[in-house]
Amino acid sequence: MVTVEEVRKAQRAEGPATILAIGTVTPANCVNQSTYPDYYFRITNSEHKTELKEKFQRMCDKSMITKRYMHLTEEILKENPSFCEYMAPSLDARQDIAVVEVPKLGKEAAQSAIKEWGQPKSKITHVVFCTTSGIDMPGADYQLTKLLGLRPSVKRLMMYQQGCFAGGTVLRLAKDLAENNKGARVLIVCSEITVVTFRGPSETHLDSLVGQALFGDGAAAVIVGADPTPAEKPLFQLVSAAQTLAPNSCGAIDGHLREVGLTFHLLKDVPSVVSNKIEKCLFEAFNPLGISDWNSVFWIAHPGGPAILDQVEDKLGLKPEKLRATRHVLSEYGNMSSACVLFILDEMRKASSNAGLGTTGEGLEWGVLFGFGPGLTIETVVLHSVPIKPGPH
């Protein structure tokens, strides 16, 4: 008779969890940041609020965002005028859109990742779905499983209302699932649309206006598994993962789901809270590896906004090129909440390959993925890059 220890050993993978494919997608509707204030104040019938519009214009100008993608078109907003008021009861209509569109966008990202992975979808053993939009039962994880035609026995985990740090959370969970279940292939999907947060401007709540200037829609999917087969192409190894709460940060970033949708609350000192905590997180993550030079690792940082990136850069003495991939994604897509860091991973491995660098991590061996959001919660994931084999010229 076998022992429990023998069963456990047989259940566990040998090697570390590895990212095997990444897929990203956005809605078709693209908004230009430079003209967005005119559009936003027109569509919300707020053009008479000239001082507030000037403030919003400055927010958009300073955002370092060029464009964003949004499911909410002008047509949809005209059909739902309650979305355009600041605090009008509108949750039912918002939910009706979100519960359909969140899984649909997630499906497109998942199909892209599965295509790159190149394996039959029947090999997917686990699904982790993350969104801040549209709670339902059964959830978006179930809808995705049905839309993709995954096996009924696939093991699902649904994460609602996590916020901007959760791109790190899903990787941490996928790591544990892949390493503790031999042969597991975990599909993780972050799908975020601003249908629950879009609202008109208010003179009394400028933090809400900050969200209107920064947030965009997008979905990203990643396949994670340990002990890759010869047919699979590893991109990054997930070496360690940690989550912590920043001290004295209660109320720094909050969201509340109410009849009016999801309201967003932000304190002015968020950039300093993040930058003051980041070094301790990095030290705890990299001390076991003997790494203390933050310019010697590649960076995947959640781009909450330009002020946060500037303060992190300054606090750690990072060279400007360290946050290139992060700033590129912020510029091209805005802040897509949990999906952002997965978009940045995708951008980094593609840019590294296109530039002829030696690894998926800008030619470097070790890297950090850093996410933060409501709590203030911080996720720190240590990544190990994979050598890029030169392709045929």
Curated annotation (Swiss-Prot):
Catalytic activity: (E)-4-coumaroyl-CoA + 3 malonyl-CoA + 3 H(+) = 2',4,4',6'-tetrahydroxychalcone + 3 CO2 + 4 CoA
Pfam family, one: Chal_sti_synt_C
UniProtKB keywords: Acyltransferase, Flavonoid biosynthesis, Transferase
A GO biological-process term: polyketide biosynthetic process
Entry EC number(s): 2.3.1.74
Superkingdom to which the source organism belongs: Eukaryota
Active-site residues annotated for this sequence: C164
GO molecular function: naringenin-chalcone synthase activity
Signal peptide bounds: none
Keyword Zinc set for record: no
Involved pathway(s): Secondary metabolite biosynthesis; flavonoid biosynthesis
CDD domains registered for this protein in UniProt: CHS_like (cd00831)
SUPFAM superfamilies in UniProt: Thiolase-like (SSF53901)
Function, in words: The primary product of this enzyme is 4,2',4',6'-tetrahydroxychalcone (also termed naringenin-chalcone or chalcone) which can under specific conditions spontaneously isomerize into naringenin.
UniProt family annotation: Belongs to the thiolase-like superfamily. Chalcone/stilbene synthases family.
Protein name listed in UniProt: Chalcone synthase LF1
Source species of the chain: Ipomoea batatas (Sweet potato)
Gene: CHS-LF1
